[in-house]
Swiss-Prot record:
One of its GO terms (molecular function) is N6-isopentenyladenosine methylthiotransferase activity. [4Fe-4S] cluster 2 binds at residues 181, 185, 188. Its main location: cytoplasm. Residues 167-403 form the Radical SAM core domain. It catalyses: N(6)-dimethylallyladenosine(37) in tRNA + (sulfur carrier)-SH + AH2 + 2 S-adenosyl-L-methionine = 2-methylsulfanyl-N(6)-dimethylallyladenosine(37) in tRNA + (sulfur carrier)-H + 5'-deoxyadenosine + L-methionine + A + S-adenosyl-L-homocysteine + 2 H(+). It is an enzyme of class 2 (transferase). Residues 28-144 form the MTTase N-terminal domain. It is found in: Cytoplasm. Coiled coil: none annotated. This is tRNA-2-methylthio-N(6)-dimethylallyladenosine synthase. Residues 1-24 are annotated as: Disordered. It comes from Corynebacterium glutamicum (strain R). [4Fe-4S] cluster 1 binds at residues 37, 73, 107.
Amino acid sequence: MTQQLNHAKVNQHPGQATLPETAEGQVRTYEVKTYGCQMNVHDSERLSGLLEEAGYVAAPEDATPDLVVFNTCAVRENADMRLYGTLGNLRSVKEKNPGMQIAVGGCLAQKDKDTVVKKAPWVDVVFGTHNIGSLPTLLQRAEHNAQAEVEIVDSLEQFPSVLPAKRESAYAGWVSVSVGCNNTCTFCIVPSLRGKEQDRRPGDILAEVQALVDQGVTEVTLLGQNVNAYGVNFVDPELERDRSAFSKLLRACGEIEGLERVRFTSPHPAEFTSDVIDAMAETPNICPQLHMPLQSGSDKVLKEMRRSYRSKKFLSILDEVRAKIPHASITTDIIVGFPGETEEDFQATLDVVKKARFTSAYTFQYSPRPGTPAAEYENQLPKEVVQERYERLMVVQEQVCEEENQKLIGTTVELLVQAGGGRKNDATKRMSGRARDGRLVHFAPEGDIDGEIRPGDFVTVTVTEAKPFFLIADSGVQTHRRTKAGDNSAVGQVPTTAPIGVGLGLPQIGAPKVAPATESACCSIN
């Protein structure tokens, strides 16, 4: 999964009379810094929701917040250095602002526990992946006791869906279907930090999706460490195990009016079944996009990784997907330099990459993570060997990406317009959007336009140029559809989702009842 840094946006809390205050009687502000994968991004939405429910408001840009929360990652080797380097920079800031608090959560906090405070004693709160709901209480306790509060629990206290959330996007939302993972990949530390897989009730998931759609969201990504294992470990003991539960969930999403795009990440090749592919092919709003982690093309390395599939099985899945969804875009994850990887093993990975024709690949150089079996393997590779293989893989994958993108020149695609400028925006004034298959397209915002194009609107364009990692559409906009999400984006309004309790959802698969329509003064859907 990709590394990224995200910041909370400004959102004024309506009930300021009850807000926590600084010593000067001012409202406390916060900033959440997120490192790591999509799971962390979504957890940070929950953290923002919790803090705003507790009375904090997000700090304006360039202002020093009263509270800084780090939601950390432990997957990559440099995660520790990034965190402690940033904490070191904050030490002097905190010394100049005595009332400032710093909290560290996420996977690195879960892993390091007491080490965080030993290395950075100016940190006020350390919390883990299983108790993010405790953050407001821990902050109060740290302030009252004038000492650091460290609370790491070994198992999930409550499913994150029971926590409020402040979403980052007006048009696209993450929805967790599960937490944790039951796989035992030898390179991965996530199961020891996130715990065993626990699956949400289908009705809770669909209710959250409906709540987002009611607020204008048109695209939802179903999120889990291994989404196609969904149904094996329901948190509700009354629900029976159902290995076809994920395909049923996808079809149920197809019944939700107003939900135009559904994506999911990430599946596991060993458990990816034909019923999911059929649901993708037969449900119109399921996007023709599949992220299928390869990790290695060598069967020997896959065995050492404990991945429980082989390259032939992997390629057969792609063949079935393309037979049923010919225009599907398939992306992947690849690790280079796993302990014991030979040149022959690496060539096997290159061979699979050439056969698989991935639209894009998240490629990582292996780094040993303490606490994982692979970190103890004796045959670790020299860094220069790993770097050289990584560079060769990037050349091959980049060529494949460009060749696949070249096939789309002259085709017309529908884009969900994204926030942020397009390629070389200052010179071209291009905007950016995502096609249904997930490809990034930079387009010229001119032509048949209904007023200003906003993030969250839909446009159709014709691809005029292809690059390895994006497409360009400079022939103008053919159609422009304004949306409620676009209206919300224009005024800086993002969705919020109220707590959805594990025990309150509907036990059966199926679209929830549609909530009564709500009118927005800024809504104009054409």
